[in-house]
Swiss-Prot record:
Major localization listed first in the record, in broad terms: membrane
Pathway(s) of this molecule: Porphyrin-containing compound metabolism; bacteriochlorophyll biosynthesis (light-independent)
Gene Ontology biological process terms from the UniProt entry: light-independent bacteriochlorophyll biosynthetic process; photosynthesis
InterPro entries for this protein: Chl_synth (IPR006372), Prenyltransferase_related (IPR050475), UbiA_prenyltransferase (IPR000537), UbiA_sf (IPR044878)
Protein's cellular compartments: Cell membrane
Chain's role: Catalyzes the esterification of bacteriochlorophyllide a by geranylgeraniol-PPi.
TM region(s), chain numbering: 25-45, 49-69, 97-117, 119-139, 145-165, 166-186, 223-243, 246-266, 275-295
Superkingdom to which the source organism belongs: Bacteria
GO CC annotations on file: plasma membrane
Protein name according to UniProt: Bacteriochlorophyll synthase 33 kDa chain
The entry's keywords: Bacteriochlorophyll biosynthesis, Cell membrane, Chlorophyll biosynthesis, Membrane, Photosynthesis, Transmembrane, Transmembrane helix
Amino acid sequence: MSVNLSLHPRSVPEPRALLELIQPITWFPPIWAYLCGTVSVGIWPGEKWPLVLLGMVLAGPLVCGMSQAANNWCDRHVDAVNEPDRPIPSGRIPGRWGLYIALLMTVLSLAVGWMLGPWGFGATVFGVLAAWAYSVEPIRLKRSGWWGPGLVALCYEGLPWFTGAAVLSAGAPSFFIVTVALLYAFGAHGIMTLNDFKALEGDRQHGVRSLPVMLGPEVAAKLACTVMAMAQILVITLLVIWGKPIHAGIITALLVAQLFAMRVLLRDPAGKCPWYNGTGVTLYVLGMMVAAFAIRGLEVLP
């Protein structure tokens, strides 16, 4: 007689589901932003290469992975509607294991952040608090289509950039670094808005007021494209003012290519979002590194 093992719920997580829980595909943006921060300082790492590598691990697998675990746990009811095959609603990570994993990774993130010095630790504390504030009740900032994507954009692009610069320079980043990092974080609000399209139906049912829910897919997509373009136009303008016309020209070319991709996106926002994430967003983050090289060595004159 055969036994249907699916009738018996798991007591421990499925190993593959653990990797799905922390979503490695999401680690690239903060790692890339962290590297942009290290480049923008204009200092050769030298003996600090271990700090650079440790910061990459912290920004990606640890803090970003922890935020994904926390979000998956807090979103398990929404995911049961949107994506029932995800690790927690499918039962592959049973009981409260998702919560325990998120808490363990929180502690581990803080411990590693402590090793990066006061600036690295401070940024880690901010990132950890932001991750929980985004997902957990009663705060749950992701319910807002404005605050939620804004917080994620700041933690995915601005905070890692700031951290990479601060860790390598062992001090507060310059005005130029902070300004460019904040502008790219502002533009990333549009990227995060596009990311909300995949959860449109579940967000409607569970009261998550994402911009696609509040404004409709067409208007939300236009707003996202406007925000992304505005941020890059401001960066281009500043680079010209700061005497970096070649770098400004490269970012302009990348923006023009994005505008063509945006035209395709706006024809079918919900259907073309995955495509745009692989094309337009890639061009956006390439511009980040160009800007990082542009501001290397810039100093405020007395």
